[in-house]
Amino acid sequence: RHIVELGNAGLIFIYDELEADTAVTWSYLLHTIEHPMIIKNDKGVMHITATNAGGMSDAYLFANDKLETKQTDQFFYPAVNWLRADDKGYFAPYKNHWHFTATSPHSPVYRFATVVSTHGQGSAGVVPEKISKDTLKAGGWIIKMNISPKGKATFTIENKAENIVLEYDGSTKITEEGRTVILKDQVPELEI
């Protein structure tokens, strides 16, 4: 999973590259605590809106195939509060949350791309525009990506006005105002 914050406009780009030894279904999950999500399929783009008291997020999910979707207010397995007790040692049970799942057809390789636009209630967020099969425009950002299971997992994000280019092609190359940095992906050590 690659996550890129696109400037300070409340935009986030997420690119998931998934591989298995055999053909399996891949699931993309989103969750909210209080309200159900609004799910629309706008011209082949899955648009999921989540709200809370302080604001809202619009997730635009791009995939190579039609995805099977569902939403539930039940946990897959009951969530057990084992961490937060009150001063008398009582562990209050968790209330159910809302869970959205988009499932792919069977494939050994799959890729999802998502643009998330966060904004206040009543204000319009940035809506990504699909320019071509593999290119999006979101605000001042142009995103070229391979979401097909064929070919290499790759994406490029560019903002000409800000003089920024980010390229992912096995390693991440960031060019900002003429200065280039190359990052190599690594699995983080988890502190549990």
Annotate each PLM feature.
Residues 1-192:
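CBM-like, beta-strand-rich accessory domains located in the C-terminal region of large
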